[in-house]
């Protein structure tokens, strides 16, 4: 059985890790390299590094920061934010990233998914989907881009299926409604996407307690759980989370 993964997320703006609620009201959470090292040492299975201002400011992710961070950790590392070409992907992989995450650029140019998948292998290509529930709808979500600022009107489930067909190797699924709230993952959203694709789904947005993480694996059928606020705020440690999940017989890599 493939091990379920715990993945700390480092949202970076202007060279610092930040975290907000529902994609707004950002607060400083520390230095990205220091946090990356801390989480790696604490037993993280992977890391995700997202430059959340890059697509809004129409610039590429900072290669230097990626390089410094990647050199400091020994675990797989995904980087995203403002990546809009095969050459940009190549630069980031050469700088030390193991995977790249595409979001706004993939919506704008879906061919980028297939081109990059052919060039580098689909194991390197993660498609980030920022999903927001439609007003007065329980089973419908729309895709947002530009750091959650722009509604594309695209149905999340249709888009998830399409990116898989185009060659995505993984989906990073963020519930904008749950982001930073620590009120629990959107289990219905996560399960709905996991049920229609055959690639791993990383659940993001809302983790606030041990039960939330267990539920997103057990009920949401996620392959990985992205963690931010509750780790940055030191509400829980990765050791505590892994111990809890292992006691409940989930296939988690033990803390070493």
Swiss-Prot record:
<keyword id="KW-0028">Amino-acid biosynthesis</keyword>
<dbReference type="InterPro" id="IPR006062">
    <property type="entry name" value="His_biosynth"/>
</dbReference>
<keyword id="KW-0368">Histidine biosynthesis</keyword>
<dbReference type="GO" id="GO:0005737">
    <property type="term" value="C:cytoplasm"/>
</dbReference>
<feature type="active site">
    <location>
        <position position="130"/>
    </location>
</feature>
<dbReference type="Pfam" id="PF00977">
    <property type="entry name" value="His_biosynth"/>
</dbReference>
<dbReference type="InterPro" id="IPR013785">
    <property type="entry name" value="Aldolase_TIM"/>
</dbReference>
<dbReference type="GO" id="GO:0000105">
    <property type="term" value="P:L-histidine biosynthetic process"/>
</dbReference>
<keyword id="KW-0456">Lyase</keyword>
<dbReference type="GO" id="GO:0016829">
    <property type="term" value="F:lyase activity"/>
</dbReference>
<dbReference type="GO" id="GO:0000107">
    <property type="term" value="F:imidazoleglycerol-phosphate synthase activity"/>
</dbReference>
<protein>
    <recommendedName>
        <fullName>Imidazole glycerol phosphate synthase subunit HisF</fullName>
        <ecNumber>4.3.2.10</ecNumber>
    </recommendedName>
</protein>
<comment type="similarity">
    <text>Belongs to the HisA/HisF family.</text>
</comment>
<comment type="subunit">
    <text>Heterodimer of HisH and HisF.</text>
</comment>
<dbReference type="InterPro" id="IPR050064">
    <property type="entry name" value="IGPS_HisA/HisF"/>
</dbReference>
<comment type="pathway">
    <text>Amino-acid biosynthesis; L-histidine biosynthesis; L-histidine from 5-phospho-alpha-D-ribose 1-diphosphate: step 5/9.</text>
</comment>
<dbReference type="InterPro" id="IPR004651">
    <property type="entry name" value="HisF"/>
</dbReference>
<keyword id="KW-0963">Cytoplasm</keyword>
<dbReference type="InterPro" id="IPR011060">
    <property type="entry name" value="RibuloseP-bd_barrel"/>
</dbReference>
<comment type="function">
    <text>IGPS catalyzes the conversion of PRFAR and glutamine to IGP, AICAR and glutamate. The HisF subunit catalyzes the cyclization activity that produces IGP and AICAR from PRFAR using the ammonia provided by the HisH subunit.</text>
</comment>
<feature type="active site">
    <location>
        <position position="11"/>
    </location>
</feature>
